[in-house]
């Protein structure tokens, strides 16, 4: 399963807007959560159209970890995928 995370316009230090590509035939993402660096808590991302987004009242602290569950029941965690100093338009691919 290949997953990529592209940082989209609208992202800023307190908000992350992502185009997440999940390539598994016949399956789609059901839930995506983010854990900030140094945090124990997973925060849910909200799906808006084809994009996923998370907002915070304080600046987000990377590198960011992601956890997902697909509609087909696949679960996975990706550590330190996107750095704090992310660039809009950049696609980040987790290491296998």
Swiss-Prot record:
Its Gene Ontology biological processes?
plant-type cell wall loosening
**What Pfam families is this protein classified in?**
Expansin_C
Query: What PROSITE patterns does the entry give?
Result: EXPANSIN_CBD (PS50843)
- Subcellular location(s) per record: Secreted
Task: Write down the InterPro entries for this protein, in alphabetical order.
Answer: Allergen_Lolp2, Expansin_CBD, Expansin_CBD_sf
Q: What is its main location?
A: secreted
Record-annotated membrane-spanning stretches: none
The terms describing its cellular component in GO are: extracellular region
Where does the Expansin-like CBD domain lie? 14-94
Q: Which UniProt keywords apply?
A: Allergen, Secreted
Q: Which family does it belong to?
A: Belongs to the expansin family. Expansin B subfamily.
By what name is this protein known? Answer: Pollen allergen Dac g 3
Provenance organism:
Dactylis glomerata (Orchard grass)
């Amino acid at each position: 399963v290949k997953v990529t995370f592209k940082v989209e316009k609208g992202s800023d230090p307190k908000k992350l807007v992502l185009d997440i590509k999940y390539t598994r035939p016949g399956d789609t993402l059901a839930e995506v959560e983010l854990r900030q660096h140094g945090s124990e808590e997973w925060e849910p991302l909200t799906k808006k159209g084809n994009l996923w987004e998370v907002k915070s009242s304080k600046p987000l602290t990377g590198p960011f970890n992601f956890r997902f569950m697909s509609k087909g029941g696949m679960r996975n965690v990706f550590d330190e995928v996107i750095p704090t100093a992310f660039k809009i338009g950049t696609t980040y691919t987790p290491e296998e």
